[in-house]
Amino acid sequence: NYGKEASSRSSDLQNLIDDVNKTQSISILAHPFDQGLSLLREPSIPWTNWEIKNFTGLEIFNLSSEFKTQSHNIFQIVKNALDQKSFPVGPDENSIVKWDELLCKGIAVNAYSASDAHQKVRRIGPFRLITFPYAFHFSALNNHLYVPEKLSGNLLKDKELIYNSLRIGRSFVGFDLVAPTTGFRFFAEGENRKAWPGERMSIRNGVTIKIDIPQESICRLIHNGNVLRQWE
């Protein structure tokens, strides 16, 4: 939602991010620990400049990077390309560790996912082969937003609601390939108000963390890298 040409400014990333923030836009570090896939001549495109500050968030789960990570030989490449449900395992461990590291330093950083879909259609004789179909990628992994009010159909108003929730991190990453995550809720309640992810509130008079999970699952509440409690 930046609305400006940015590639020519890549030599001064901090200046670019500062300008993004001035315009109330969003800066997300994509596939920060991406690995290459030499068999397909796919280069490694990780994020390496961790000196920058004040970016909005980083991707902790990217399906395109996950394909490369889980494809170690030609047989796995073919299998994963033909059966897209076979390769997504979960969020990138290195990205989770980096996110946790930043949070433990008191740096507010949001977590995002990316379908990073690259549907390809190939013809093999009379056959038409579709790999990485959009329908699969856009349903397997999603950023779910907590918007403060129902979308109205007014484009400008709804865009502001959506972008604002993305900007402050009022959202969660849902690995919907495993099970639908719609209906998951995580919020803090206290002082006659609720605070959703990305929001702040005083804990002076006590706060209750509430979690609603749409299906039976294992739930871990983690703080500063430590599991405070686990439910099954």
Report the location of each language-model feature.
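Conserved beta strand-loop-helix elements of the APE1-like EEP
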Residues: 1-3
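Domain-core and long-helix interface of multi-subunit machines
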Residues: 5-134, 149-150, 215-227
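C-terminal functional module detector
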Residues: 105-111, 115-232
